[in-house]
Amino acid sequence: MLIMNLQLFAHKKGVGSSKNGRDSESKRLGVKSADGQFVLAGNILVRQRGTKIHPGENVGKGKDDTLFAKVDGVVKFERLGRDKKRASVYPVDVEAIAE
C-alpha cells in the first residue's frame, strides 16, 4: 500500500484587511468673522462645541453653540476676566462707513 504524505501550500497570498483607513469629516469649527470686521445681522461669528466664546452685546447663541450677529455692526472679541472670552457686535452708522 502506497501512503502519500502531501503538504498543500496556498497558491494565493492571503490578504488581510487593514484596521486603518477611516476618518470622520471635519466639522469646520472656528472663528468665521474677524475682530473689527463689519457683519450683517444673521452672519455667523463663531462655530464651536461648547461655549469657548460666550455671546455678548447683540450676539445670539444657537442650539449647537454657534454665535451669530443679531444686528448689523462691527465684531469685537473681548476678555471676561482671565479665562473667558466674549464676542459682541456694536452697531455703526452706515453713512459713517460710506464716507
UniProtKB/Swiss-Prot annotation:
Pfam families: Ribosomal_L27 (PF01016). GO terms for molecular function: structural constituent of ribosome. It comes from the Bacteria. Signal peptide: none annotated. GO terms for biological process: translation. Residues 1-9 form a propeptide. The keyword Ribonucleoprotein applies. Keywords: Ribonucleoprotein, Ribosomal protein. The N-terminus is cleaved by ribosomal processing cysteine protease Prp. InterPro entries: Ribosomal_bL27, Ribosomal_bL27_CS. Belongs to the bacterial ribosomal protein bL27 family. This is Large ribosomal subunit protein bL27. The lineage of its organism: Bacteria, Bacillati, Bacillota, Clostridia, Eubacteriales.
